[in-house]
Amino acid sequence: MSLKLKIGLWIFRVIPLAVRRAVFSGLAWLGYRLSVKHRLIVLHNLTRAFPEKSPAEIVRIAKASYRSFGRVVAEFSEITRLNPDNVHQWVRIQGLEHYDEARRKGKGVLLFSAHFGNWEIGNAAMAIARKPLIFIYRILDSQFLEEAITYVRATCGNISLDKENAMRPMIRALKKGETINILIDQNVAVYDGIFVDFFGRPACTTSGLALLALHSGAPVLPVFTTRMPDGKYLMEIGAEVAIRKTGNRAADVRESTQVFTGIIEEHIRKYPEQWFWMHQRWKTKKCQAREK
């Protein structure tokens, strides 16, 4: 661990959590006010996703989404303090029976989720409750943030795996019975994904999860870590999602990816304030794609 990271984590730890939450919520509010570009992205995304909502409600959700992300940042260093004795103070887990049943199949487990609630604390809670997992992610541009995030995740035993060229390592991991968690709610380039419906609009989505499930036979489960009114989190592990297997690989991948995306949309609709609306989810357009 670099000296800069040691100092940074020490500063985070000595500042009371309540103060951190207040500070980062304030910074999030400033971000909403000062960054016109990102504010317009959020408001546009929300207006298209919820045409039935009033402008005032759209603005309320937008501001709450910023605050939610601020809390994720403020709470991140708390992961280093989580252990079997105190994790229940942060997270209550529902659906572990689905996960245990999936593990008993002996083909590894594929979890999928979104940048929703506090996915990082959810990953840590899963590692403590059962076993560490492999988290697929994109390496950050900032070397300091990259080191910090990788270190904090590893304190619970979780492994961060760069999504670039990750297919073979993931297949090997599943053969060893490992658990892999993939967030599939981000826009991808046209050559990296397929278009499926998301909030009524075509969204270019990674096909990697469906391809991996078809190749490995590993069970696929949704998981969401939602912030509750009391400030704690509810981690919900869903039942295994059936994978379409007709022999037409392209159609099977598209249909399964649509099912996964539909599950994510359904959960976001329940708690729209907790999703990352700042992201340009619909950036890639169908006109950029050649007919396949």
Give short role names for the model-derived ranges.
Residues 103-164, 187-194:
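Catalytic core of membrane glycerolipid acyltransferases/transacylases, capturing the structured
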Residues 86-91, 138, 156-161, 199-200, ...:
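Short, flexible loop segments at the rims of nucleotide/cofactor-binding pockets, characterized by
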